[in-house]
Amino acid sequence: MSVGTLLNGLLVSIVAALLWKYSKLSEHAALLEEELHMTRQSQELSQAHIDYHVALQALQEHGTRMVCTGKMHTDRICRFDYLCYCSEAEEFVFFHSNSSVMLPNLGSRRFQPALLDLSSVEDHNTQYFNFLELPAATLRFMPKPVFVPDVTLILNRFNPDNLMHVFHDDLLPAFYTMKQFLDSDEDARLVFMEGWEEGPHFELYRLLSNKQPLLKEQLRNFGKLMCFTKSYIGLSKMTTWYQYGFVQPQGPKANILVSGNEIRHFAKVLMEKMNITRAAGGEKDQGNAEDEKPKDEYIVVFSRSTTRLILNEAELIMALAQEFQMRVVTVSLEEQSFPSIVQVISGASMLVSMHGAQLITSLFLPPGAVVVELYPFAVNPDQYTPYRTLASLPGMDLHYIPWRNTEEENTVTHPDRPWEQGGIAHLEKEEQEQIMASKDVPRHLCCRNPEWLFRIYQDTLVDIPSFLEVLQEGVKAKPLLKKSKLSSTLHPGRVRDPQCQTSVQTSNEAKLTVSWQIPWNLKYLKVREVKYEVWIQEQGENTYMPYILPQQNYTFSDNIKPFTTYLVWVRCIFNKNLLGPFADVLMCRT
């Protein structure tokens, strides 16, 4: 082999090596450039810094991780690390690696019917959440992910066009879910996955966080694959008090877990975020007398401009002013900003409104205020009670009065409107006549009952004498609002040091003495009435004997037998109905 050939071969090898190295450097540079681009995209979403390479490595090596609370899909909320969303498929993706965690690991039960509810409306088949599964290795064949470094709460808004649904289904549940699960709730980002546009009340959702909420449609703008570094999915249902009639006719929930205290705390926070201070006279400390009026008591009337009108609104306003000798103010969702309406309502003594979503603003009323709800002809106030239920929650301290139009000649119907506004022209003539002749809408399921829609969208000429009569009777029945003491709602702790002593008197007589010390927290409370409940059960029997006692010891002799073992439980009761827990059971042998 000649020297020239050898040098040529060597030169080719060197050039090939250089080209290979250059291609690798170019590939690495392209990768770095892509990572930089993806980092920029991630940072477009958030001010939080993210190390893209570290985040990508974590996803590839550890995959997605999930830990949930709750036993059923209806009460489950899940925390995810590195859950991803593919905007192309419109699906969430769980990437599996050897380090992935999935608790609960339900297998196919995850589809019976879903992992969880995305909204606070229980078990609604349009609100189910689930995800697809892929091995983490498939990330190599997918578009580079954009990472969302914020802690996110992912949910569905149920009906963002309706103010009642906005508060009851979305804002309250999201507010307390964030309190429960998120470390810094004001810095969390809300992600709405139901697919709706912003809607008329989007500013209210913005109040929950310092960060702009994201809509489902916006996610595709940030890339084909988005990965949430830390997210919570689902909403707590503990703050909801009403069910809308999907399974049974609408009404209060069977097991209400929220009180007025939580509602009022939420309202206070929202007012602060809207820069609203409660109007003068709003917090009325009435003490034991109601005749001493604050400087500026006034009544608020909600005015509607399109449907469900009060046809003689001006006459109604004059009658209220004369009857109660108060100023009457009108507010309108169509004409005023929401904060300005809340400012007015927060100081009102009475809120008067036709049935409708605007009555959810009653949660901003001061304690002691009156809520007056008007119902159109043939609509039974006892069957549609979201605002009555709200007003009656313990701690809301609102007095609720319903009025119903009972005169058919005082109603104006709209049979030719679209069906969703109560029109019935699309129905068979026989069904139209049946609806027109009906005097009372029968109980029904949600959501398209034509008779209900026909009647609820009527306009009403309010019969002033009957309206004032109902109001007078209702106001008479209004309880005095006393300044509530926190101690009046607190429960006793367990009685301390319970003991029993026994003695046998004769072959068929015995005595059982039970004693105990007061609950530890009682020494710090001023309680009007303290009593104790004692249960005595003969061992082996199913029944027990209950006793209510004012003192801390008592000797029982009736029905106490010698040489018998008795089980004894003791608990404290404040003010007749605030029950404490039972102390550990005593086993007492005579």
UniProtKB/Swiss-Prot annotation:
Pfam families, A to Z: Glyco_transf_61 (PF04577)
Glycosylation site positions: 98, 275, 553
Keyword Endoplasmic reticulum: yes
Residues spanning the membrane: 5-25
GO (cellular component) term, any one: endoplasmic reticulum membrane
Pathway: Protein modification; protein glycosylation
Keywords linked to the UniProt accession: Endoplasmic reticulum, Glycoprotein, Glycosyltransferase, Membrane, Signal-anchor, Transferase, Transmembrane, Transmembrane helix
GO biological process: neuron migration; protein O-linked glycosylation; protein O-linked mannosylation
Subcellular localization, as worded in the UniProt entry: Endoplasmic reticulum membrane
Enzyme class: transferase
Topology versus the membrane: Single-pass type II membrane protein
InterPro entries associated with the record: FN3_dom, FN3_sf, Glyco_transf_61_cat, Glycosyltransferase_61, Ig-like_fold
Fibronectin type-III domain: residues covered: 494-590
EC number annotated for this UniProt entry: 2.4.1.312
MF terms (GO), sorted A to Z: acetylglucosaminyltransferase activity; protein O-acetylglucosaminyltransferase activity
Catalytic activity reported: 3-O-(alpha-D-mannosyl)-L-threonyl-[protein] + UDP-N-acetyl-alpha-D-glucosamine = 3-O-(N-acetyl-beta-D-glucosaminyl-(1->4)-alpha-D-mannosyl)-L-threonyl-[protein] + UDP + H(+)
Membrane topology (Lumenal): 26-590
Claim: Transmembrane is one of the keywords in the record: yes
Sequence ranges on the Cytoplasmic membrane side: 1-4
Sequence similarity: Belongs to the glycosyltransferase 61 family.
PANTHER family, alphabetized: GLYCOSYLTRANSFERASE, PROTEIN O-LINKED-MANNOSE BETA-1,4-N-ACETYLGLUCOSAMINYLTRANSFERASE 2
Function statement: O-linked mannose beta-1,4-N-acetylglucosaminyltransferase that transfers UDP-N-acetyl-D-glucosamine to the 4-position of the mannose to generate N-acetyl-D-glucosamine-beta-1,4-O-D-mannosylprotein. Involved in the biosynthesis of the phosphorylated O-mannosyl trisaccharide (N-acetylgalactosamine-beta-3-N-acetylglucosamine-beta-4-(phosphate-6-)mannose), a carbohydrate structure present in alpha-dystroglycan (DAG1), which is required for binding laminin G-like domain-containing extracellular proteins with high affinity.
UniProt-recorded name of the protein: Protein O-linked-mannose beta-1,4-N-acetylglucosaminyltransferase 2
